[in-house]
A protein has these predicted regions:
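Conserved DEDDh/DEDDy metal-dependent 3′-5′ exonuclease domain
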Residues: 3-4, 20, 43, 50-132
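N-terminal accessory regions of nucleic-acid-interacting proteins
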Residues: 1-33, 37-44
Length: 132
């Protein structure tokens, strides 16, 4: 029933808002990079570095990968929220996900793998379904 509105954007301020609840991770990782003594460079034979060199799954599984922040908006009239490590877990987001709520993300595959391999596996957050 809500599939037809997925991706819909509504003008808001100087940007756009989505119709469905959404989330976005900012992360750090040394995956797909090599330290050459002065800077991080692409691995030998690769033309790119970081996630572009290894892909979302390998990036999310790398032991150095960490969440720097999580922004989310449940479209519940409370507005966008920001979670950073050290804060209390985002319980209202957990409840929304556990109730089967649908979420949008700019790069949903990346967000899914970070949730699964960093947040669930390392931080004990609940499992996120795939909507399928």
């Amino acid at each position: 029933m809500t599939a037809h509105i997925a991706g819909t954007q509504i003008p808001a301020g100087c940007g756009f808002s989505t119709v469905l609840p959404d989330l976005d991770f900012e992360t750090y990782s040394e995956a797909g990079c090599i330290w050459n003594g002065t800077s991080w460079v692409a691995p030998i034979g690769a033309t790119k570095k970081g996630i572009a060199a290894v892909g979302a799954v390998v990036y999310s599984e790398h032991p150095s990968t960490e969440v720097l922040s999580l922004s989310y908006d449940l479209k519940d009239s409370l507005g966008p929220r920001l979670w950073i490590p050290g804060m209390a877990p985002p319980v209202e987001l957990f409840q929304f996900i556990q109730a089967g709520g649908l979420l949008e993300a700019w790069n949903c595959i990346f967000e899914y793998w970070i949730w699964k391999n960093v947040c669930t596996a390392r931080m004990g957050w609940p499992v996120m379904g795939t909507g399928g």
